[in-house]
Every structure is written in structure tokens, then in C-alpha cells.
Design a protein with these regions (language model features):
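Conserved catalytic core of nucleotide polymerization and phosphodiester-bond processing enzymes
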Residues: 1-245
Length: 245
């Protein structure tokens, strides 16, 4: 009974949130959604990340194996046209290795050499071998640190006990020191200058910066500083690629 209720709620949410909204904004069989590049009264993000409204196409479900394909099947390309799906391979890890190499941080040399010798290098696999931990755990820690995730949240993502998480972090930072060093440098820059400028010139200010020890009870500006450095640069390269297309 509980599963049936949960399933009914999921179907109702899909209908009211997605299907009704899509039909509402449909005009002659087409959807003309608003693409927000900057924050405004009509939507958008303060970081400059693309967002959609009327309807929000980024919320079209994908994980539900039954409802997802059915709702996404509503969208088809124009006649004689084909849709493409493009994605950079491990964008964040490549940027981390790039900037860690520029700063000559300890431990990044072997990873940088791997990228130079093989463009298909798997960063998470290399880090897993360096730290002596499973690849999935290495990937979770990598992405968590790139985005300024605190220890408690990382522990929850890893699904391990506090003691096990502490041991994993210790092992990771001892064997892969350049990731934490780079994140600390970004945090220090935001603290000293009160701002970070992205590759495309976007200025992100931190007037309420609260310095804290890395990864422990992080303040929101700390997370924002890391997001503006790595993912902010990632967005810049993605925008350039979109313009070329």
C-alpha cells in the first residue's frame, strides 16, 4: 500500500509539474522556453549558470525509468534535423590538475604527466590508486572537494561511519595533497581579496566572507568561492563551445 501511494504521488507530481506546464506553454506544437543567462526578476542565477523558465526544461525527469522516457518523448527534433548531446570529459578534474600544475603543488606531477601522455586519462581511477581506495569513493571525495562539500555531507554521500570517513579523508589527503592545497588557495584568495573573477570576467564578491578551517563547518561563501573557481571556469568553456556550434 505504501509503495502504491508513493507511486501515485510521483505520477501526480509528474502530471501537474511537467505535463500540465508543458501543455500550458505549447504553441502550435512547439515550446519556446525562456533561457536565462543572468539573474533577473523573471528568473536566472547569480552565478551566470544557464537556467530555463516557462517551462523549466531542466526539471524534465530523467531518473524515473517509467515516467522519464514517456515525458521526454514529448520532445522531438524538427523534420530532417537531429539532436546532439555533447559533454566534456571530466572537466572539473582537468581544471584542478591544470591549476595545481601552474602552482606547482606537491603530488600533481604524475597526474599531469598522465594527461599529457593520454588524453583519455581517468582522473578518478588515478586518484583511487594513489590513495589506495575504491574508485567510487575516490570520485565522491574528488567532486565533493571540488564543490566545497563539508565533511559531514561527504560522509553522508560516502555512506560510511564517521570513523571510516575520517580515515578515508586522512588517507586521501596524505596521498593526493594537491586537491586540498588548491582548494585552500582558492579560499584564501576569496578571503584576502573579497572577490573572485571568472575566466569570462564575471566578478563574484564575498562581502560576508567567514574564514574557516577547510572542510569543517564551512560557511556558505567558502562553498561559493570554490564553485566560482572550478565550475565557473567550466561554464566559461562550455559557453564558448556553444557559441562555436
Amino acid at each position: 500500500l505504501v509503495n502504491k501511494i508513493a507511486q501515485a504521488r510521483e505520477i501526480n507530481k509528474a502530471h501537474t509539474t511537467f505535463i500540465d506546464t508543458i501543455l500550458k506553454h505549447s504553441h502550435k506544437g512547439r515550446i519556446h522556453a525562456d533561457i536565462n543567462q543572468l539573474r533577473s526578476d523573471n528568473g536566472g542565477t547569480v552565478t551566470g549558470r544557464f537556467s530555463y523558465s516557462n517551462p523549466n526544461l531542466q526539471q524534465i525527469p530523467a531518473r524515473n525509468k517509467d515516467l522519464g522516457p514517456r515525458i521526454r518523448a514529448l520532445f522531438i527534433p524538427e523534420k530532417d534535423h537531429t539532436w546532439g548531446c555533447f559533454d566534456y570529459s571530466q572537466q572539473e578534474p582537468r581544471l584542478v590538475v591544470h591549476y595545481a600544475t601552474l602552482q606547482n603543488l606537491y603530488g600533481v606531477g604524475d597526474v599531469s604527466d598522465s594527461y599529457n601522455n593520454d588524453s583519455n586519462t581517468d582522473f578518478h581511477d588515478i586518484v583511487a590508486k594513489m590513495a589506495g581506495i575504491p574508485r567510487l569513493q575516490a570520485k565522491t571525495i574528488n567532486l565533493g572537494l571540488f564543490y566545497g562539500m563539508g565533511k559531514n555531507k561527504l560522509q553522508a554521500e560516502l555512506g560510511v561511519s564517521k570513523d571510516k570517513a575520517t580515515e578515508l579523508f586522512r588517507q586521501y589527503h596524505n596521498k593526493v595533497p594537491f586537491v586540498k592545497q588548491l582548494m585552500d588557495n582558492v579560499s584564501s584568495r576569496a578571503q584576502d581579496r573579497g572577490q573572485i573573477r571568472t575566466l569570462l570576467g564575471r566578478l563574484c564578491r564575498f562581502p560576508l566572507w567567514e574564514p574557516n578551517q577547510f572542510g569543517i563547518h564551512k560557511a556558505l561563501p567558502h562553498e561559493q568561492a570554490l564553485i566560482e573557481h572550478g565550475p565557473g571556469i567550466k561554464r566559461a568553456y562550455t559557453y564558448k563551445a556553444l557559441n562555436k556550434l
